[in-house]
Amino acid sequence: MFAYFKGSLVTALPEEAVIDVSGVAYRMLISATTFRQLPDEGSQVLLYAHLSVREDALQLYGFFKEEERQLFRLLLLTSGVGPKLALAVLSGLQVPEVHEAIMANEPERLYGVSGVGKKTAARIILELRDKILKLPLVTPAAGKAAMPSHHVKDDAVHALVTLGFSRLLAQKAVSALLEEKPEQSVEEVIKYALATIHNS
């Protein structure tokens, strides 16, 4: 029904965003992955949309990238996986990581996500392994090459927190930088993150 919403970002929270489109405010639930990529409040933003229809409610979900929305919809095809759990998966893992876990038959990578048990992780892999090949997602090889190592991100965030910045601000700045330049060292990430924070 809705392809996307484009407008002014009114509110950006870790679990939801509000966008003003021509004077109408739309509340959308988002993943942590999308939250980290959002611009500052008041900026223009485009979020790809998914409308969940239930008997008692209509709920919009927003995604910064189309491939995240595609994977969200694919996860919903799994028995026992609803929008809340699908969003939790996309908050705990990035798109290439989910793709790799499914293709490599590694359920332990999925049940490390809050709310995903061993049986659910096994079902996701069993039911989606063939379906995921039909999506124009990042290939496992390409995804692995582009993914920054976790220690770089963790060390950079820790350093920024030590310098007095909030963990949320540090995580957002570091994640945004590594999204564009995943090959950066810890020192480079800290340097550019500091510049980004001071210029914001």
Swiss-Prot record:
GO biological process: DNA recombination; DNA repair
Protein family membership: Belongs to the RuvA family.
Matching CDD domains: UBA_RuvA_C (cd14332)
Annotated stretches, region: Domain II: 65-143
SUPFAM superfamilies membership: DNA helicase RuvA subunit, C-terminal domain, Nucleic acid-binding proteins, RuvA domain 2-like
Domain of life: Bacteria
Oligomer status and interactors: Homotetramer. Forms an RuvA(8)-RuvB(12)-Holliday junction (HJ) complex. HJ DNA is sandwiched between 2 RuvA tetramers; dsDNA enters through RuvA and exits via RuvB. An RuvB hexamer assembles on each DNA strand where it exits the tetramer. Each RuvB hexamer is contacted by two RuvA subunits (via domain III) on 2 adjacent RuvB subunits; this complex drives branch migration. In the full resolvosome a probable DNA-RuvA(4)-RuvB(12)-RuvC(2) complex forms which resolves the HJ.
One GO term describing the cellular component: cytoplasm
Region described as Domain I: spans on this chain: 1-64
UniProt keyword annotation of Repressor present: no
Keyword line: Cytoplasm, DNA damage, DNA recombination, DNA repair, DNA-binding
Function: The RuvA-RuvB-RuvC complex processes Holliday junction (HJ) DNA during genetic recombination and DNA repair, while the RuvA-RuvB complex plays an important role in the rescue of blocked DNA replication forks via replication fork reversal (RFR). RuvA specifically binds to HJ cruciform DNA, conferring on it an open structure. The RuvB hexamer acts as an ATP-dependent pump, pulling dsDNA into and through the RuvAB complex. HJ branch migration allows RuvC to scan DNA until it finds its consensus sequence, where it cleaves and resolves the cruciform DNA.
Gene3D superfamilies: 5' to 3' exonuclease, C-terminal subdomain, DNA helicase RuvA subunit, C-terminal domain, Nucleic acid-binding proteins
InterPro entries from the UniProt entry: DNA_helicase_Holl-junc_RuvA_I, Hlx-hairpin-Hlx_DNA-bd_motif, NA-bd_OB-fold, RuvA, RuvA_2-like, RuvA_C, RuvA_C_sf
Main location: cytoplasm
Region (Domain III): 148-200
Positions of region (Flexible linker): 143-147
Notes on the domains: Has three domains with a flexible linker between the domains II and III and assumes an 'L' shape. Domain III is highly mobile and contacts RuvB.
Name of the protein in its database record: Holliday junction branch migration complex subunit RuvA
Species this protein is from: Chlorobium phaeobacteroides (strain DSM 266 / SMG 266 / 2430)
GO MF annotation: an example: four-way junction DNA binding
Compartments where located: Cytoplasm
